[in-house]
């Protein structure tokens, strides 16, 4: 589109001699093929005029200027057929350049102005409003590759409310700023995913809700198209997570609940429990300590509702290494553990007396 607009504008502003007759306020450069006295007439007369560079104008002349209907043809093959006023393209008309760009619609002082249709050689097409040679107001832009936009334009750019569709089935409905999806909007994806919320420069950024095709729902903060910051995620199974996210995954401090009744509150890394946290089981057990890759690993304390308690080392979710096990009556074992069982040498404390003891996979042998 700029090719045509620039050509016409340059002609009007600089008054190039080669195309002076197209836009100049003065038609002195026109050479009539059919001699006459049109320049002195106060009513339009249809004449054929030829410029020295080979451009021709056939149409009405009034007071020495193109006025009314006329056809102007440039030496390179560009052509305008339509209305003129005071030597400029004004009113209804069609311009086609040698490369195949075509504009048909309203003009004002040599520029697209009003309603019109612009077609590219590639097959792309725009129909809608123009102001001073640029897309403005409401219009429809259809690309040759199957994309389309229907909505508001400002200063030649998508700006305001509109609907943008892709050939693969994606669809956006919402606000645009400076040609980009920015503001509030709704995005539909071919696989059934839906996002509704804020956009910045074409990406999901700000507050929003994403419903994935598998039923997972995230509501919270987005940045650069991903869940980032504070949010809440819910799975079809009934699992929920609320807390910090990074790169679309639970990451940082958060709380997760399972349908079984288990609950975890603490640190996450890349979607799994990792770091310091507390896991409360539905049966009343409570673990408070370190986690690694989703399992109890490191130092921690496991308490039972019956009053039993273990404090010590864990490996891959099991009591492993050195630890202290306390019974409800106050009896205590301090020593080694293996796969959740008392194992190895230790000290058994009962009734206030400490006695060396030894266990083999939970069975006392000394």
What is each of the regions a protein language model found here?
Residues 2-10:
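Bacterial N-terminal signal peptides that target proteins for export
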Residues 11-16:
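Sec-dependent N-terminal signal peptides
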Residues 19-22:
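C-terminal motif of bacterial Sec signal peptides marking the signal peptidase cleavage site
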Residues 24-31:
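Bacterial lipoprotein signal-peptidase II cleavage site
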Residues 31-83, 92, 366:
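N-terminal segments that cap or nucleate solenoid repeat domains
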Residues 56-67, 79-90, 102-113, 125-136, ...:
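Conserved anchor residues at repeat-unit boundaries in beta-strand-based tandem repeats, strongest
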């Amino acid at each position: 589109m700029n090719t045509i607009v620039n050509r016409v504008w340059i002609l009007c502003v600089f008054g190039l001699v080669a195309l002076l007759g197209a836009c100049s306020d003065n038609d002195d450069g026109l050479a009539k093929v059919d001699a006459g006295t049109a320049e002195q007439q106060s009513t339009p007369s249809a004449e054929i005029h030829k410029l020295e560079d080979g451009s021709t104008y056939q149409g009405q002349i009034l007071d020495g200027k193109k006025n009314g209907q006329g056809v102007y043809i440039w030496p390179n093959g560009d052509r305008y057929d339509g209305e003129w006023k005071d030597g400029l393209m004004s009113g209804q008309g069609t311009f086609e350049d040698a490369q195949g760009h075509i504009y048909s619609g309203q003009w004002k002082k040599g520029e697209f102005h009003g309603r019109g249709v612009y077609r590219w050689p590639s097959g792309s097409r725009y129909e809608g409003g123009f102001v001073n040679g640029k897309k403005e107001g409401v219009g429809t832009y259809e690309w040759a590759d199957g994309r389309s936009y229907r909505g508001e334009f400002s200063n030649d750019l998508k700006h305001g409310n509109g609907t943008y569709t892709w050939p693969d089935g994606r669809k956006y409905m919402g606000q645009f700023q400076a040609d980009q999806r920015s503001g509030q909007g709704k995005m539909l994806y071919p696989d059934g995913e839906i996002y509704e919320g804020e956009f910045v420069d074409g990406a999901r950024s700000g507050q929003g809700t994403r419903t994935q095709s598998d039923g997972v729902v995230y509501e919270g903060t987005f940045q650069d198209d991903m869940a980032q910051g504070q949010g809440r995620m819910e799975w079809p199974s009934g699992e929920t997570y609320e807390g910090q996210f990074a790169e679309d995954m639970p990451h940082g401090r958060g709380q997760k609940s399972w349908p079984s009744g288990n609950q975890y509150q603490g640190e996450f890394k890349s979607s799994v429990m990792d770091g310091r946290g507390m896991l409360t089981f539905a049966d009343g057990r409570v673990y408070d300590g370190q986690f690694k890759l989703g399992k109890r690993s490191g130092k921690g304390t496991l308490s039972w509702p019956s009053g039993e308690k273990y404090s010590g080392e864990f490996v891959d979710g099991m009591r492993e290494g050195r630890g202290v096990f306390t019974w409800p009556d106050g009896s205590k074992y301090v020593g080694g553990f293996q796969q959740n069982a008392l194992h190895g040498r230790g000290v058994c404390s009962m009734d206030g007396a400490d006695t060396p003891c030894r266990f083999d996979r939970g069975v006392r042998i000394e």
